[in-house]
Amino acid sequence: MVVVAVAGGTGGVGRTVLDAIAKSGQHQAIVLSRTTSVPTAVDEPKRFAVDYNSVEQMKKILQENNVQVVVSALLLVDEAVAQSQINLIRAAAQSGTVTKFIPSEYYIDFHAPIPYVSLQSILSRQRFSLFSTSGADLFTNFQLEAEAELSRHAQLTWTLIRVGIFLDHLTMPHNPKTTYITPFWVFVDIDHEQCVFPGDGSQPLVLTHSQDLAAYIERLVGLPAENWPRESVVASNKLLVKDLESLVNKVTGKKFKVAYDSVECIHKGRITQLPSNTAVFQDPAKGEMFRDVEHQVMLSMLSRAHDLPGKNLAELFPEVETTDIEDFFRSGWTLKQSRAP
C-alpha cells in the first residue's frame, strides 16, 4: 500500500483524485491543505494544515506519514500558489520518503507557442497564467517553473499529465457523472442552447472527464517509478472543435445558436459570451479570473496546443473505462429534459 499526499485536496481535481483512491482501496491518502478540519466520516483521509511557505514543516509532515507519492492539485492562479508548489517539490525532495511527484498540469502542452499574443497585451494585464504564450520568456510560466524545479531533484520521478479540457464543462449544470469542477461554460451552454467556437472550428480538441484523469492517477500511484513516463496523456475524446456542433445537433435533435468567433476578435478579447457565464463573470472574487480563463482557452485553441505529446495512459492501463463524449452529452441532455418544468 502506497501513502499518497494530495495537495489541494479540497479543490475540484483534488477531491476527484481522493475519490478514486478511496474507491480502489489500494492506497492510503492524506490531504494537505492550508486549513485543517475533522473528517466527517470514518473513511475520510486525514487532513494536515500546512504552511506552504515552510519547506521544513511540509517535509516533516511527509516524513512522519511515510508519504511516497505527492499529487499536486493546486490551482496555479498566481505567484503565491506557484511558489507553494515549488516549496512542496523541495519538501518532497528533502523528505527521504517521497519518490514520485505529479505536479499540477492537467490541461495542454505548456511548451506549445500560443499565437496572436503581444508583449504589450500581456504587460497590461494582471499576471495570471494558465499556459505559456510563447514557451519562452514573455512572462514567467508557473507550470514551466515547476518542471524546472523538478528537474533539479534527481531523487524524484515525475510526470506531466495532459488531459485537454475537462469534459465536465460540456453539460453543466446537468452533470451525469459526479464532478467537483467549478461551474464554468466552455464552447457549449446546454441550458441556453448556444455554442461558441474559435476561428473556423478546425482545431484539434481533447476532452477528458475529471473522473478519467483521477482513475489514471490512481493507477500511476501504484506503478513502479521506473515505468513512469515523463510526459503522460489522458485523451478520452479527440475531435475537432467544429465536431461539437454536429454532436449537439445529433443528440438533441435541435439547432443550437452557434457563433464562430474570428481570430481577430479572440485576439482582442471580444469573445461571444455564453449566457450561463454571466453570473460567473459577475462574481466579485473570481469573475476577472474566469474572463482570463475564457480568453486563454480560446487563444490556446488557435494553436496546436491540443496536439498533446506524451505516453497515452490508456496503453499503460487498458482496464480503465473512460467517458465517451456522445454518451456523456446524451446523458446530460436527458437529465436536462427531466428537470424541465
Swiss-Prot record:
Source organism (scientific name): Metarhizium robertsii (strain ARSEF 23 / ATCC MYA-3075)
EC number: 1.3.1.-
Keyword list, A-Z: NADP, Oxidoreductase
Disulfide bonds: none
A Pfam family it matches: NAD_binding_10
Disruption phenotype: Leads to higher level of PA accumulation.
Role noted for this protein: Oxidoreductase; part of the gene cluster that mediates the biosynthesis of swainsonine (SW), a cytotoxic fungal alkaloid and a potential cancer therapy drug. Swainsonine production occurs via a multibranched pathway and is dispensable for fungal colonization of plants and infection of insect hosts. The first step of swainsonine biosynthesis is the production of the precursor pipecolic acid (PA) via conversion of L-lysine (Lys) to 1-piperideine-6-carboxylate (P6C) by the aminotransferase swnA, the latter being further reduced to PA by the reductase swnR.
Protein name: Oxidoreductase swnN
InterPro entries xrefs: NAD(P)-bd_dom (IPR016040), NAD(P)-bd_dom_sf (IPR036291), NmrA/Isoflavone_reductase-like (IPR051609)
